[in-house]
Amino acid sequence: MDIEKMTTTMQEALGSAQQIAQVRHHQVIEVPHLWRIFVQPNSFGANFYKDLGIDLDDYTNLIEKEIDKINSVEGSNITYGQNLSPDLFQIFTEADKIAQKMGDEYLSTEIILLALFELKQNPLTSYLVSHGLTKAKAQAAIEKLRGGDKVTSQNAEETYKALEKYGVDLVAQVKSGKQDPVIGRDEEIRDVIRVLSRKTKNNPVLIGEPGVGKTAIVEGLAQRIVRKDVPENLKDKTIFSLDMGALIAGAKYRGEFEERLKAVLNEVKKSDGQIILFIDELHTIVGAGKTEGSMDAGNLLKPMLARGELHLIGATTLDEYRKYMETDKALERRFQKVLVTEPTVEDTISILRGLKERFEIHHGVTIHDNALVAAATLSNRYITDRFLPDKAIDLVDEASATIRVEMNSLPTELDQANRRLMQLEIEEAALKKERDDASKKRLEIIRGEIAELREENNQLKAQWEAEKKEVGNISEKRNELEHARHELEEAQNEGNLEKAAALRYGKIPEIEKELKAIEEKAKSDDLSLVQESVTEEQITEVVGRMTGIPITKLVEGEREKLLHLPETLHQRVVGQDEAVEAVSDAIIRARAGIQDPNRPLGSFLFLGPTGVGKTELAKALAENLFDSEEHMVRIDMSEYMEKHSVSRLVGAPPGYVGYDEGGQLTEAVRRNPYTIILLDEIEKAHPDVFNILLQVLDDGRLTDSKGVLVDFKNTVLIMTSNVGSQYLLDNVGENGEISEETTENVMSQLRAHFKPEFLNRIDDTILFKPLALEDIKNIIVKMTSQLSHRLEEMDVQLELSEEVKVWIAENAYEPAYGARPLKRYLTKVIENPLAKLIIGGKIPPKSKVIVTLVENKIDFDIQTIAE
């Protein structure tokens, strides 16, 4: 017996049998040791016996009992499991003879299984024979398994039933009702049928963007084959989806992958055109299994494709087809392209209506038609980096899953009642230990409350259970209806007209009637604790969660917040009414849903001197909309003064450092599509920057360096500039009004600095007025209030007299510099002296500091606050 002349699987089995013998302290390897390895789950031997009708659990128990009967030998110099027992040796001898007779080069597992029948007195043989498995039956099964092939490699077992092992029968899946219906796509399915019917080049490859339904087209073809809705040449054919991952996985030795693939191709070849092979992600065959000195899958397929021995359908994306398939011209020309375009919103709604029932059965929910329409329209508008129908199906699935999770969770009312009950029970336990009258009185009150709450709790729980049961009944009935419809389809395909008639005119209408009655009852009962409907509202919530864009219906609090947005912004930005109104209107338009869907929410150019609130307004808007001023994309345009730095906005071009990192502007918006973009000091940027912004301002789109389209339609663009600020400073009226002449001077300077095509695309150019003395006083109040808040944390109160505020305003006011000198002056005359007093221990906690003006100087009066 030469172990080198055994297949790899057989060698591994013998090694494992030896380990069992060593662990059990058995001197030799017996027949049950080896057979214990053969019947392990999913092994070759287990599948062989299972296919021949042997009860594996029963047979495994017998093998275990036989192993237990073998005597263990103990001792110091004894070697375990080094030799074969006479019975096992006889099996190998017989197997050698059978292998030679069959012309095999290696001894494989199935020959050993066959040789067992030579041990007629062995309990394992007796069991097989008594259960109807004879040597002749086993031999016939082996011949069928091999299909006339001889064992010429050490991986022979890997190549048996290769298609079953490395592929999925799509036609069988359709027959068993495991596939979702395919709606529409008739034209593409007809194209595939036409290509498959050709004499040469009869291998279609479906090319389209990810998520447009390429795989679904092949599933649709499988469904047509089952319904016999195909030409004669395709009737009774089978489509096998090849799993390239399973084919490559575990191929340890050189040539093993090629052997597996050749075995698959041989099975397809032997079927004489009855099997159509489907490879999803077709580009993976280029280079698959390629190691030094071996061929890749693409080269193995070429000869069969050229001779027309293989019917193959492929599916891949446009990018991957270009990258992998078009580089191998010999492989590419053997395929016929079928382009799969993205369906329209109307087609997507039809697809969703076809899938609706499947989702309802899976999740146990009711999906309203308005939810399907919303899923198609909202995904098309807001989820721009993916394709229909995939993204719309995802929304429906996600919304249904959300409702399903809520249905199984405790309702809010019941949860609150439980928490309150627990709280009272804890209080009751604590009061039981007290002996005073007040505690006893309180205990009585609590016990009364607990009794009431328990009653309420039990009622709510009973109501919840009843509602859940009602929803469960609907779900069960839907499942029953689905099963009956599948039975009807099977009966029609098999030509069993009697059964089909009984189902169509008897069972199905009866179930439909029962289902309608249950649904009507649920509607009239008005389920208040269990929400089982998926409506437009749930879809908008999912879209909002996925994109960060608020498109849900406005709740009352949010309406108030939006309507009072100008007043809220004025609390931070003093003066500048026109700017605040313009920005607020853009946001209100967006949330009302009436803005142009093909442009950004708003684009503004803020002009004015330094320190008047241009950047502050953008920050205030971000804080109001997103509760944090960090939630805005701020780009300081002074960093983009050189021509080469422009590429940082959209990403470095291929071949340059930083190509993989993406652009500062495009990446920020891609991650958070609903945002405020602040382009600060825009006049400092290189003129080429404005060329990039033209598409953003006009169409709300920008393509980054990788060719990915970034959507700017849900952003507010704010650009700030100091162009023409000198005119505003010199010529502003006494009441802060800007004259027409000044406006014209500023605009002419603006036109001289920026190109007309850039200025023409901006929604509004807003001139910020220089701050008047009254505005400065308001800003002082705001700044000192911020300082007061900081001091309150140290338990110190701050109070400024009115004359101090006026004095600071008059001394710090510089029209040319706006509010910024005010901050510096406040630090100098208030914050610095205060800091020294605190460090010196002059201002202890629980103090009040009153700031007054004494002889034109700031004076600090420190008082202790009475307890």
Swiss-Prot record:
Q: Residue ranges of region NBD2?
A: 558-770
Per the UniProt record, one Pfam family is AAA
One Gene Ontology BP term is: protein refolding
Coiled-coil ranges (or none): 393-527
> InterPro entries this protein is in?
AAA+_ATPase, ATPase_AAA_core, Chaperonin_ClpB, Clp_ATPase_C, Clp_N_dom_sf, Clp_R_dom, ClpA/B, ClpA/B_CS1
Question: What are the transmembrane regions?
Answer: none
Cite the entry's keywords alphabetically.
ATP-binding, Chaperone, Coiled coil, Cytoplasm, Nucleotide-binding, Repeat, Stress response
Q: What is its main location?
A: cytoplasm
Asked if the record carries the keyword DNA damage, the reply is no
Q: Could you tell me which residues belong to the region NBD1?
A: 161-342
Q: Where is this region: C-terminal?
A: 771-867
Location in the cell reads: Cytoplasm
Residue ranges for the region (Linker) are 343-548
Gene Ontology molecular function: ATP binding; ATP hydrolysis activity
Residue sites binding ATP 1 per the record: 208-215
The record's region (Repeat 2) falls at: 84-148
- Which parts of the sequence bind ATP 2? 608-615
Q: Where is this region: Repeat 1?
A: 6-70
Task: Spell out the SUPFAM superfamilies in the cross-references.
Answer: Double Clp-N motif, P-loop containing nucleoside triphosphate hydrolases
A GO CC term assigned to this protein in UniProt: cytoplasm
> Can you give the residue ranges of the Clp R domain?
3-148
Q: What does this protein do?
A: Part of a stress-induced multi-chaperone system, it is involved in the recovery of the cell from heat-induced damage, in cooperation with DnaK, DnaJ and GrpE. Acts before DnaK, in the processing of protein aggregates. Protein binding stimulates the ATPase activity; ATP hydrolysis unfolds the denatured protein aggregates, which probably helps expose new hydrophobic binding sites on the surface of ClpB-bound aggregates, contributing to the solubilization and refolding of denatured protein aggregates by DnaK.
Q: What is known of its domains?
A: The Clp repeat (R) domain probably functions as a substrate-discriminating domain, recruiting aggregated proteins to the ClpB hexamer and/or stabilizing bound proteins. The NBD2 domain is responsible for oligomerization, whereas the NBD1 domain stabilizes the hexamer probably in an ATP-dependent manner. The movement of the coiled-coil domain is essential for ClpB ability to rescue proteins from an aggregated state, probably by pulling apart large aggregated proteins, which are bound between the coiled-coils motifs of adjacent ClpB subunits in the functional hexamer.
Q: How does it assemble?
A: Homohexamer. The oligomerization is ATP-dependent.
> What's the name of the protein?
Chaperone protein ClpB
Protein's gene: clpB
